[in-house]
């Protein structure tokens, strides 16, 4: 069985399990949205999934109620919890707040959503992230640069490098990629 067939089989099994097991369904909501959005926007599933793992991966799955406030991660218990924490952070003057499965930054991208609650919706969150990553790929002509820019702006090379290396490590850990000589050299 080829690696590609194995991945499809695993993703199919995950989708089947998610549709038949309510406990898994809530835990795998981000992953299901990733499979759909990756196909819609022509993004290799492994890349979008590895970006998600880098952003909110915890205990083997992505977290729809994750947030990051000014560099400090918080994993909420539900949407009400996260929205309350969001409101508290904004009242304290926090500007850099990332929300949801793919950690969409409210300050830079919030205008594309009707509300912070909408940003936490796994479908909207992952869909927006996939479209954004696809646009970055078109602009920068490589997935590596798209991933780098997803996390940090053009003037933050150290953060971009660290992030790209974390995404590559997640690609390798999940079986979607392997360490190439160039990647190994780059991530030293």
Regions found by a protein language model. Name each.
Residues 2-12:
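Bacterial N-terminal signal peptides that target proteins for export
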Residues 11-20:
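Bacterial N-terminal signal peptides
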Residues 26-188:
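Catalytic glycan-binding domains that act on GlcNAc-containing polysaccharides
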């Amino acid at each position: 069985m080829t690696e590609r067939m194995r991945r499809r089989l695993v993703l199919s099994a995950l989708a089947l399990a998610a549709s038949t097991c309510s406990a898994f369904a809530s835990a795998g909501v981000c992953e299901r949205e990733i499979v759909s959005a990756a196909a819609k926007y022509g993004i290799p599933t492994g890349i979008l999934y590895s970006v998600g793992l880098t952003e909110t991966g915890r205990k083997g799955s992505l977290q729809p109620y994750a947030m990051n406030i000014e560099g400090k991660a918080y994993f909420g218990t539900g949407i009400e919890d996260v929205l309350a924490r969001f409101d508290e952070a904004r009242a304290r003057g926090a500007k850099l707040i990332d929300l949801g499965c793919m950690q969409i930054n409210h300050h830079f991208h919030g205008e594309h959503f009707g509300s912070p609650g909408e940003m936490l919706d796994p479908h909207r969150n992952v869909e927006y992230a996939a479209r954004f990553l696809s646009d970055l790929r078109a602009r920068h002509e490589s997935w590596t640069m798209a991933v780098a820019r997803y996390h940090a702006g053009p003037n933050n090379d150290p953060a971009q490098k660290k992030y790209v290396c974390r995404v590559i490590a997640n690609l390798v850990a999940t079986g979607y990629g392997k360490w190439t000589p160039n990647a190994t050299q780059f991530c030293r």
